[in-house]
Amino acid sequence: MDEFHRYGKEDSSWQQCFLYPLFFQEDLYAISHDHYLDVSSSSEPMEHLSSNDKLSFLIVKRLIGQIRKQNNSIFLFVNCDPNPLVNHNKSSYSESVLEGLTLVLEVPFSIRSKYSVEGINEWKSFRSIHSIFPFLEDKFPHSNYILDTRIPYSIHPEILVRTFRRWIRDAPSLHPLRSVLYKYRNSPENLKRSIIVVPRVNTRFLLFLWNNYVYECESILVPLLKRSFHPRSSSYGSFPERTHFHRKVKHIIRNFRRNSLKSIWSLKDPKIHYVRYGERPIIAIRGTHLLVKKCRYHLPIFRQCYFHLWSEPYRVCSHQLSKNCSSSLGYSLRVRMKPLLVRTKMLDKLFITDLITDEFDPIVPIVPIIGLLAKEKFCDISGRPISKLSWTSLTDDDILDRFDRIWRNIFHYYSGSFGRDGLYRIKYILSLSCAKTLACKHKSTIRVVRKELGPELFKKYFSKEREFDYPAFSSKAAAHSQRERIWHSDIPQINPLANSWQKIQDLRIERKLI
């Protein structure tokens, strides 16, 4: 990458047309095929691969020759697979060509990402899971409105090509990308749609396509939002000091003229914050209701003008934190007022001051969790436990271990919430469902199962000690668990509640597109 960048600085004409010749290099397809075999071997044993899955470089040469002879690279995919992006039984040739196309397009993208980290570009990534919980702890309590939106993934294929065209000067290198996208658009599943729905399948090409599209959305939108509002401050500092400081600033503003407000406003805290998890960005705003209405109005217009796609206004929802809760990542997010007692000693006198501060208070959504358990056949819709019939063929230890693992995952995921009393209702449902499953397996009653297995067995698996049997929990954390907040940033990736809302919204939108 460094060599490409150095050559690009020396010769700008070479920088404009260096991508397209890479499609004719056999080494590129060898690398992509090795990557394809590595991915396949991780999910499928090598002895189960047929002889047709082996790549012949003689056929690769013929495919490269077809690219040289034909102006349109669509013939390359016709000979390999009728629908390479939709059919899961992909041939090694179409997969290798897509991998090679991704490798070529990743060259300028990697250079841009590398030098943006070094300071050439001021844009920073907001999609890290580690940035979500500091946002909730630090920025969320200082906002009074939340804009809940989503990044639209339904877009015309030509718009995707134009996003690449903004930073790739080599126009011929985008012809294979255009052919692949239009091939997918003309597939039987998308014939009734006028736009392409970017599928979220775990392939290198589609992940690269989606990441670049999100990069383009955020690199334009986030600096625009921050430029429209006041500069950011480095930190909030202690709450009492900042509270008295804001009172002084408000007093100064009343006495100054209007033209001097810019220097005063620069001392205040930022008024807008942005974070994203998956396809769902969250914009926290501290301002008036009129400001929130302007943001809701301009966000769809910005997407319509910049990306040439229509985004319905109902996709941007606003929530006032003092009245409503906002659901995200499987939590019900709210802000509550917390009284703070401050004692100040000056010489021989002691002053006691009561301050009211805002505190982030996530709520455990018991009703959605019960709905998810009902969907997985652990209970009915009213929360009454039932037996898990599909697990009756397992051993007793496996059944107990599975139920206990589900409970510990739920408990660890919601360990960042202070009020966890409602979680023990979930524990009751899982423990009783486990007992009913064992009773159904042994064709007996719950009382007989408890008498045969012993009450100590259920205490062993569903005990409070096992709730803290986790590397992040220590003995001190277990003792002070009710007043300490511990976040587990790896669990949202596997928690169904974090993505259930998004799946429902995607199904509604896709039905409207058909």
Swiss-Prot record:
Pfam family membership, one: Intron_maturas2
Encoding gene, per UniProt annotation: matK
Protein name per Swiss-Prot or TrEMBL: Maturase K
Its job: Usually encoded in the trnK tRNA gene intron. Probably assists in splicing its own and other chloroplast group II introns.
GO terms for MF: RNA binding
Single GO BP term: RNA splicing
Superkingdom per UniProt: Eukaryota
Cross-referenced InterPro entries: Domain_X (IPR024937), Maturase_MatK (IPR002866), Maturase_MatK_N (IPR024942)
Protein family according to the UniProt entry: Belongs to the intron maturase 2 family. MatK subfamily.
PANTHER family, per the entry: MATURASE K (PTHR34811:SF1)
Localization per Swiss-Prot or TrEMBL: Plastid, Chloroplast
Keyword entries, A-Z: Chloroplast, mRNA processing, Plastid, RNA-binding, tRNA processing
GO CC list: chloroplast
Biological source species: Tsuga canadensis (Eastern hemlock)
Signal peptide as annotated in the record: none
Main localization category: plastid
